[in-house]
Structure formats: C-alpha cells, structure tokens
C-alpha cells in the first residue's frame, strides 16, 4: 500500500509540474500577441523615413504638422525631443538645414514651446490644403521642382481661439523626395483638409 501511495504522489507531482509548464507557456503566448499602443511621440520617432518617406508635398507638410503638434502639446523626454528634432530635420531641404543648424533649431523650438506653455497656448487642429490647391512650379533659373502647400493652425490661448495660415515651399531633392525649403505666415486660405 505504501508503494501505491508513493506512485500516486509521484504522478500527482509530475501532473502539477506539466500543468504549470503548460499554463506558463500559454500565458506567455497570449501576452506576446497583444498590441502595444504607441504614443504620438513614439509613432513619429519610430517612423522610418528612409523607407517610408511621405510621397507628396502635402504628406510632408502633414507629417511636419504632426511633429509640431507633438512639440507643443505632448510630454516627452530630452532624448525623445532630440529624436523629434531629427525627424523634423529629415523633411527639411539642405538649404534650410544649412541656415538653421541643429543646435539653433533645437533652442528655437525649446523657447517657442516654453512661450506656448507660459501663455497657455495649444494647437487644437492642423489642416493642409486640398491636393488640387498645391501649386507646382519649376524654377526657371535652375530647373528645381517646387511645390507650394498652405497649412492652417487652429490655436487656443486660454479661452481665445485663433487661426493662422502658413505657406510651405518644398523642393524635390536628388532622390525625388519633397523637402521643406521655406515657410512663412500668410493671410487666410479658402479651404483646407483636416489632418486630425
């Protein structure tokens, strides 16, 4: 009888160990398949612009607007801020980059963000003009392909709302990518498409 008890106890131990391994493996497989939600900051930082560069001038401005919205409206670490700056600079033309060295650009963004926060300003919505409103030109002097894209920004400052417009000038580079060459504030635009 004693031998039967030992055999039953041994079988019970083996069954418990096997059940434990099965449950642990099943739990790990279940959790490894879960989708991880990325923050807006992480989505921008993780975008591989080498292989997934925006195809049109509008898409470049939309991506840049996502970066701007994150600059002014999200929380991020210093490391994430540096990565955001690198992403923003990847959609800028070499001429714009030369005129705005990385350290100067970073400092200007930091100051502007601090000013926004001090004034309780928030970018509520960004919009980009319709595809048929993008103006394409060729520079007669050097043959550069240019595109002009209008964007609008709906900004809240405390309880006051304001809408501003910017014109982006983009130039096609040697790889065929549209890069932001310049941008400046303008008076209103007749129509836009929401980016949000």
Task: List each language-model region with its residue ranges.
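Amphipathic, hydrophobic N-terminal targeting peptides for secretion and organelle import
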Residues: 1-42, 195-196
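Short low-complexity stretches enriched in small and charged residues
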Residues: 18-23, 44, 99-106, 122-127, ...
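Short beta-strand edge/turn micro-motifs at domain boundaries
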Residues: 28-39, 161-196
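Core segments of small alpha/beta cavity-forming domains
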Residues: 40-120
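Hydrophobic core residues within well-ordered beta-strands of beta-rich domains
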Residues: 60, 147, 164-166
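A mature extracytoplasmic/lumenal domain signature
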Residues: 103, 151-155, 168, 182-185
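Surface-exposed, charged secondary-structure patches
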Residues: 109-157
